[in-house]
A protein has these predicted regions:
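Catalytic cores of enzyme domains
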Residues: 1-13, 17-145
């Protein structure tokens, strides 16, 4: 999926392939931890042609995840985030200018970069995945011990 570059971030964002790691490296990163908190937020989106609204919803979802994770880390639950999209802490990503990542401890990759099939994950967690009644869910995870 990532190599299709539908989001435009392949090779230009540290959090995205090929820079974030191989599929096996990403899988091992998750499997090295014992727990995962799966989080879903729901957004009213009239239709998928509203790309600005979709981007804003993903951004707000990821921002909410980062706020939650800050609290979890403060309580001693060290881990990492998997977002609804690739990292957007710096716009553009420092990779575009050949600079080092400014936030390596906060950078997050998307579910696709981890080869996570979100529909199956949602079903396994008994969570709604489907877009219906103009409500679109976004998913994220916090992986920790």
């Amino acid at each position: 999926y990532c190599e299709e570059n539908l989001c435009g971030q392949y090779g230009v964002n540290y959090s995205c392939p090929p820079d974030c790691g191989t599929p096996d490296q990403m899988k091992q990163k998750v499997l090295a931890h014992k727990k995962a908190l799966v989080v879903s937020t729901e957004w009213e989106i009239e239709d998928f042609s509203q790309t600005d609204k979709l981007k804003e919803a993903k951004s707000l979802h990821n921002a909410a995840m980062l706020r939650m994770i800050k609290k979890l880390k403060a309580d001693g639950h060290d881990g990492f985030m998997i977002g609804a999209s690739g990292c957007s802490l710096c716009k553009p990503c420092k990779l575009a200018n050949g600079e080092s990542c400014e936030h390596p401890d906060m950078m997050y990759s998307c579910m696709a970069a981890y080869c996570i099939w979100v529909k199956k994950l949602a079903e396994d967690c008994n969570m709604n995945y489907d877009y219906k009644d103009k409500i679109l869910p976004f998913f994220g995870m916090y992986v920790f011990d």
